[in-house]
């Protein structure tokens, strides 16, 4: 495909990295022949067009986030406070009908855009695979570009992987899951691609390259005339959804496909966004296929939103489940809102990993998954997330047994009772205890996750759970909150206050434990010490950084030719 408007007249510039690029685009990532098939001149022109058209609106949206943060830090509370959009909240309107290809989304599997993962996930028996450029991926140049190559091969049906260690070749089955792609959030830059001298917006790179190369094959092979399909993360306001809607419309126009072809599910994973669900769906009404409970990031956002409110300390994060009043209210309101507007209400993640060496523990873990999924389906959710193929049969069984033969519950479960959920319901303080073990677990998991992320892995199995960046974020902000306000511990640490000294002792103990668990050799070779410094610096910062990954990103940026400055 080629832009008629650009043709062959657009100036070609060869950068030091060896890629042919249009005017104003500079690539600082390593040259690779396979990457060059993705980073074509026309594809880069499309990304540059998106960047130039939307960069000022993106900047404004990020500034608005900062203003909202200042208001919350001054004591304001988030709420349904927008009189200008009252007509949207109270009006009777629906989103465009759900495409038949994705009517049934009972179980969705998620994972990074790695080659073997993509094949296994598409073959897993799940209805949908969400391929992730966001929290499950460390956004190194190699990971991002290989991910684009892998997705192109997956959409074309040609993807295969030879596992030399097992001498096994992985290929796609005849029946595969529908593919959704999650680009990065608005706040993350792509430092390896400069447009007019500035780093590109990460999500526009992820979306633009994937859409440009795959929309035609996707609509033919996967979407039955619709698509491509996306998941959109980390939004805090409907103005951000409006930008995405405009991006989709521009992409559809460029490709010459009908308006409303592209479809997206928005993750409601920030506290401000829960008060904007109607508005978010309204902005995307021609392109929406629902909302999803991104519950781990939602808890992280709760702490971040109330960072200047010492009266809202979170209990141990393991106690902040969906039965907490503010979490249940969020889930119920999401179901009611989605079904009222005619779209899917997706449940949250089951992060458990099968425990192969302990059948009793494995059985108990699966029972927890079943219980959680039963709660979701009875609450009216149309589907759910799983992090591991081994969980899919259990999740599918629970949803299928409780939904009859219907693909979803959009008409069957209106949840009118949730219409009365108040602002107070959505921000009610969570109940529970704060323990020394909670502080230890946060520290142990946060450091290990960050060490993996710095060495290129964004989806990390830890203590029988598949963890992504959301877990590290909760761990970090909770430690920060407890330290900032000198929280008094319960349980074993009864009466002990969280101080710099206590955190220092905990870090020392947990680093020794990590070394014992992973072994001296791996500990020495890994980036545990660097991760520890970064994690402790974040926990002890006088003001809370918005995102751990934003702070850590410069550590994985490698500019070519070597010696180019980092951001």
UniProtKB/Swiss-Prot annotation:
CDD domains: malate_synt_A
Active site: 182, 468
EC class of the enzyme, as a word: transferase
Intrachain S-S bonds: none
Record motif Microbody targeting signal, residues: 565-567
Pfam families given in the database record: MS_C, MS_N, MS_TIM-barrel
Keywords, sorted A to Z: Glyoxylate bypass, Glyoxysome, Peroxisome, Transferase, Tricarboxylic acid cycle
Keyword Transit peptide found: no
Name recorded for this polypeptide: Malate synthase, glyoxysomal
GO cellular component terms, A-Z: glyoxysome
Entry GO MF terms: malate synthase activity
Species, as recorded: Ricinus communis
Domain of life (superkingdom): Eukaryota
PROSITE patterns attached to this UniProt entry: MALATE_SYNTHASE
A biological process from GO: tricarboxylic acid cycle
InterPro entries according to UniProt: Malate_synth_C_sf, Malate_synth_sf, Malate_synthA, Malate_synthase_CS, Malate_synthase_TIM, MS_C, MS_N, MS_N_TIM-barrel_dom
